[in-house]
Every structure is written in structure tokens, then in C-alpha cells.
A protein has these predicted regions:
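Short, well-formed alpha-helical segments that are part of the catalytic scaffolds
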Residues: 102-130, 134, 138-146
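Short, solvent-exposed loop/turn segments at secondary-structure junctions
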Residues: 57-59, 113-114, 194-196, 236-239, ...
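A structural signal for short, well-ordered beta-strand segments and their strand-loop junctions
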Residues: 132, 187-191, 229-234, 289-293, ...
Length: 399
């Protein structure tokens, strides 16, 4: 008789590194997550974990046949019955008759990726108007790509007044920031150009959302506070659907998809890891950076999409590795620069076959969310007209 495994009291999804910075302010999330979409995300552990050892390769293959799953020497763990990783492919959070438009303009900074335009195609599919900042030598290619991918209706190309400067994407991001101020915006979104999809986390499911509403929810939540200067969604691959998470985490870094207040005094700088750097400077002022778990981004893996930083920075510093398609040394300078800029909280570590930075966010646990004056919130749930379409026809997939 197999009994359900007992839960270790010390186990918590909040203990893992991706949510470092979890503090009392996050433990009180239910006091803040009001007049927001319904959010239920509880731990849903396996019934039982069984560790198995096989005496021979033949025994291993016989076992694979008996359970009807493919097992190789690289297989570390499996679910039984077999986990259906495609079960949510045709599920989408869509709008029921009304779409909430964005309050703040959205920018993509892109270089040398007119042949993919991953983020722009995703936003256009969701019918979200946005800007793409490109360098002069790329303008013609990007303009042609708007017709190739049939996204011209939703895209405005902005030609940056510089090219091939080699000092990182910060210059283009600052230029987009200035552009947003020039059109009267009080905040702006700035996105990497390799974000394929965006997701809502609810009821232990990561399901794509298919309109601007998910971004609007994040905007509305952030706009309640006087001291949240940077916010954005968590990476999908850092959220395990069967673990417990709060809908947001305060006092941590935001990557790749950032909502930034235009009155933030800190601008982009540095050639590498500029996302973490700007967030650390904001938090060192006693202000808050807020990362959403309730809404997530699906990012292509670092250095796997040609163009952009992959060509200009990581591989350029170790050209021999370009022949192999991936440069394991490409992130060492990126990590070291952050450690040099923030030696009080950042160090360089080797993990998962490549160099990473490690940041201690504990010093920022004292940074509390502060409501703006005259904020009056309704109690209860506001689902923003989102409904679950169980048979969404995505042109990228076929049944």
C-alpha cells in the first residue's frame, strides 16, 4: 500500500532562488490582490515519489515498454500516468466582448532579428499596438518584415539615431524611454525581442492569454502604489504549475518585459545584465520592484536566437564557440560586471553548465508597498471580462 507522501514543513516554492526577496510584504498579498482577477494557486504534489534502480539496460528498456513511455540515459524523472505537456495548447484566456486597452505605450528594442520578430508577432496576434526601436541599417529589413508577417497594422517602427555602438541595449531603451515621455506617457513598457507568448497562472495551470488585458491588469495593480517604479511578469519556465506561489513578489529583479515609471531617476546603463542593475538601484533607494507570478512571459532561451545580444556581445567575445552554436563562456563578463557594480549583494557562480550572477535580495525586505493617496479599492474579484476559450484556433498550431 502506497500512502501519499508527507509534506515537509520546510518545503515551499517561495524558498527557491527565482523568488528570492520574498518577505512579509508578499505574505500579505491577499490584502493587496483585491479588485483583481481570481487567483488560486496551491501546492499540488505528486501522490508518491518512487526512486528506481535497474540492474541492466534491458531491464530499463523493459520497464519503459511496460509503462508506455520513452526513457533514455538522459531521463531523470517521469510522471505516471504520462504527463500531457500539450493539454493546454488550445486553451486561451480571451476577452468576453470588451478588451481593456493598455494605459502605457509598449516598446520592443530589436537588432538584427527582422527574420524572426518573435515578440512583435506575439503582440500583433493579440492586437496590441506597439513600437519597435531599430537601428538605421536595419530599417529596410524590418519594414519588409511587417508585410512578411502581416503585422504592419499593429507596429510603428522607430529609427534610433545611432548604430553598432557596442555598449549594450541600454542606449536604445533609454531612447525609447525619452520617446514615451515626448508623447506624454507617465510610464512605458520595454520588451526584449524574443518573447513568444504570455500566460496567466491560475488553478495550477499556465495558460496563454490572447489580448492586452493581461498587461492592463498589471498596469492597474502597479498604478495603485506610490513607490513601485519597475514591474513585470515572471518567466514561465520558472513557475512550476503544481507549486504554490503568491500572485506577485516584491523586492526582486524584473527581466525582459518591464513596466517602468517615467519619473524613475535611474536610467539604463552597462553592457550586460542591465535589467538586474537598474532594479537593484531602485531597491537601494527604498523603493519597490514588483514581479508578477499571476502573469508570465514565455522567453526563448538566452543565446539561442540569432542576432541581438547573441551576435554582438556573447559570441563576439569567444568567436571559436560560435562554431558550436552556444558559448558557455559568453555569460562570464555579463555576470562579473554586475558583481563589480554591486559587490555588496552580487557574486559570480557556476550553475547548470554556465556562469550566472547570484544576488542577495534580503537587504530589500524592508521596502514596503505604499498606496497612493486617495486610493479606494473595491473588494472582491474583478476578472476583467476574461473567459477561458477551450478551443482556441491558433494559426501556429494544428490539431
Amino acid at each position: 500500500l502506497l500512502l501519499p507522501r508527507s509534506k515537509n514543513k520546510s518545503e515551499s516554492a517561495l524558498d527557491i532562488e527565482i523568488n528570492e526577496g520574498v518577505t512579509d510584504v508578499n505574505a500579505k498579498w491577499k490584502e493587496h490582490w483585491v479588485d483583481m482577477p481570481e487567483y488560486v494557486q496551491e501546492e499540488n504534489p505528486s501522490f508518491r515519489t518512487i526512486h528506481m534502480h535497474f540492474r541492466t539496460e534491458q531491464h530499463y528498456q523493459d520497464f519503459a515498454k511496460r509503462i508506455g513511455q520513452e526513457l533514455t540515459e538522459k531521463t531523470n524523472a517521469i510522471w505516471h500516468p504520462k504527463l500531457d505537456i500539450t493539454k493546454n495548447r488550445f486553451l486561451r484566456w480571451v476577452d468576453d466582448g470588451f478588451t481593456f486597452p493598455l494605459r502605457h505605450p509598449m516598446y520592443i528594442v530589436s537588432k538584427g532579428r527582422a527574420d524572426s520578430m518573435i515578440t512583435s508577432r506575439s503582440l500583433s496576434r493579440m492586437k496590441i499596438p506597439h513600437y519597435i526601436v531599430v537601428e538605421p541599417q536595419d530599417m529596410q529589413d524590418y519594414d519588409k518584415a511587417l508585410d512578411t508577417f502581416d503585422i504592419r497594422q499593429y507596429v510603428t517602427l522607430l529609427e534610433a539615431p545611432f548604430s553598432n555602438h557596442g555598449d549594450g541595449p541600454g542606449r536604445a531603451r533609454n531612447w525609447a524611454w525619452d520617446h514615451s515621455i515626448s508623447i506624454g506617457a507617465t510610464s512605458h513598457w520595454v520588451l526584449d525581442d524574443n518573447l513568444a507568448d504570455f500566460y496567466r497562472l491560475h488553478n495550477n495551470e499556465r495558460i496563454r492569454f490572447e489580448s492586452s488585458t493581461g498587461f492592463r491588469v498589471m498596469e492597474d495593480f502597479v498604478d495603485r502604489y506610490d513607490n513601485v517604479y519597475i514591474a513585470g511578469p515572471q518567466y514561465r519556465f520558472f513557475i512550476a504549475p503544481n507549486q504554490k506561489y503568491p500572485p506577485y513578489v516584491a523586492n526582486t529583479r524584473i527581466y525582459s518585459c518591464l513596466l517602468i515609471r517615467n519619473d524613475c531617476k535611474h536610467k539604463w546603463r552597462g553592457r550586460y545584465n542591465e535589467d538586474t542593475d537598474i532594479c537593484l538601484r531602485v531597491m537601494k533607494d527604498g523603493d519597490v520592484c514588483l514581479q508578477f507570478n499571476a502573469f508570465m512571459q514565455g522567453k526563448m532561451a538566452t543565446q539561442t536566437v540569432s542576432g541581438g545580444n547573441t551576435a554582438e556581445f556573447y559570441h563576439a567575445e569567444n568567436t571559436d564557440a560560435m562554431k558550436e552554436g552556444y558559448n558557455t563562456d559568453g555569460t562570464i563578463n555579463k555576470s562579473q560586471m554586475l558583481a563589480d557594480m554591486h559587490p555588496d549583494v552580487a557574486t559570480v557562480v557556476w550553475r547548470y553548465g554556465r556562469w550566472h550572477h547570484h544576488v542577495n535580495y534580503n537587504p530589500f525586505k524592508k521596502n514596503k508597498l505604499k498606496f497612493k493617496d486617495n486610493i479606494h479599492l473595491s473588494t472582491g474579484v474583478n476578472n476583467y471580462n476574461m473567459i477561458l476559450d477551450r478551443n482556441f484556433q491558433d494559426p501556429r498550431f494544428s490539431k
